[in-house]
Amino acid sequence: MKEVEVLVKVLSKKNDVLDILNKFNFIGKKKVLDIYFYDEKRDALKPKEGKLTECFRLRKKDKNNYITYKIDYFDDAGTWIYSDEEETQVNDFRVTTKIISHLGLKPLIEIDNIKHTFLTNEYEIVLEEVKGLGLFLEVERQNITKTENISEVKQKI
């Protein structure tokens, strides 16, 4: 699935941002743990200049667990444009972690956060409280068609 998103650090207070976001359709608040993995033997899953071109993620979202393979696309200047993601649900977080380890993937980073999700007609808007890093706002549009200009979609966001 092709998605286009914009992620920015939030400098305002959480309650001030939530007051503004509450005019949209509130979907819910979820605790999310993301563990990103890399493979020392595969160039695509190694950090390059502080960026990943591809990554493998294990996510715990409330009581559900998911594995995701994500491919990021960048413009000629190295600016992230969009991602393609393949994701599926898995049952057992602990067993999945062991399988990933047996495959030789190494944990790169863990991101522990609380996500407040809102919807509009076109966008998913998420206020993220990231442990140790602060507040972030993500605005995402999914299901981008092949004929749409990614830069124009991103500019509209």
Task: Label each residue range with its predicted role.
Residues D75-G78, G134-F136, K146-T147:
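A short local loop/turn or secondary-structure capping micro-motif enriched for an aromatic residue
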